[in-house]
Amino acid sequence: MIVEPLNLPGVLRITPKIVRDVRGVFIKPFVDVEYREHNLQTNFAEEYYSISFQNVLRGMHFQTPPFECYKLVSCLYGFIRDVLLDIRVGSPRYKMCEIIELDAKDGEILYIPPRYCPWFFGDKQIGNLLL
């Protein structure tokens, strides 16, 4: 697993090990021990899966204390642009956005800490996993 920090503080791009062979592709997106080795939150309380149609903008999901949580976002089919809005009051990037592209073939995962408001846009039919 490769963990790469992005421009937004605390937001990470995780690239899990991907095995490709004649049968297809095998990806293990979450391994508790590996996440802990990188000091990442592993106590996820919910999991969601959505399928969006072409040109749909979805999201602006966030929780306020005491319900705020970390999120894992990955594209399971096609391609998405994930937009993260910084809603951390007092942050130098408060109310600023960053666009991060995710392609299902890469298997990458965004690790999003509390107080970021994610939403995403798919230009094809897509699947999106939130943990």
Language-model segment annotations:
Residues 102-125, 131:
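Conserved metal-binding segment of the jelly-roll/cupin
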Residues 1-105, 124-127:
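Non-catalytic, conserved peripheral segments adjacent to functional cores
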